[in-house]
Amino acid sequence: MVNMKCVALIVIVMMAFMMVDPSMGVGECVRGRCPSGMCCSQFGYCGKGPKYCGRASTTVDHQADVAATKTAKNPTDAKLAGAGSP
């Protein structure tokens, strides 16, 4: 009877280990960066696999795009600024 309980416990523990996805994340990206060999997901978490590395954009890329958009000059702004000048 004791042996059967031990076998059942071992089987349950083994199944629990098998259910853990090896590509599960290890935490949040810090300033858009992750430990070596890991990718930053579009939601800001580090991990391996297509859920994290599948898309080309990373948090760093997104931040660079936002910064570039904020600093880009709108061509219509220049026309409006010079509209009242001779």
UniProtKB/Swiss-Prot annotation:
Record keywords, A-Z: Antibiotic, Antimicrobial, Chitin-binding, Disulfide bond, Fungicide, Plant defense, Signal
InterPro entries from the UniProt entry: Antimicrobial_C6_CS (IPR013006), Chitin-bd_1 (IPR001002), Chitin-binding_1_CS (IPR018371), Endochitinase-like_sf (IPR036861)
Signal peptide boundaries: 1-25
Record-level Gene Ontology MF annotations: chitin binding
GO biological process, one term: defense response to fungus
Pfam family, one: Chitin_bind_1
Residue stretch(es) of the prosequence: 56-86
SMART domains: ChtBD1 (SM00270)
Ranges of residues in domain Chitin-binding type-1: 29-53
Cystine bridges: C29-C40, C34-C46, C39-C53
Subunit organization: Homodimer.
Cited function: Chitin-binding protein with a defensive function against numerous chitin containing fungal pathogens. It is also a potent inhibitor of Gram-positive bacteria.
Additional remark text: Its chitin-binding activity is strongly inhibited by divalent cations.
UniProt-recorded name of the protein: Antimicrobial peptide 2
Originating species: Amaranthus caudatus (Love-lies-bleeding)
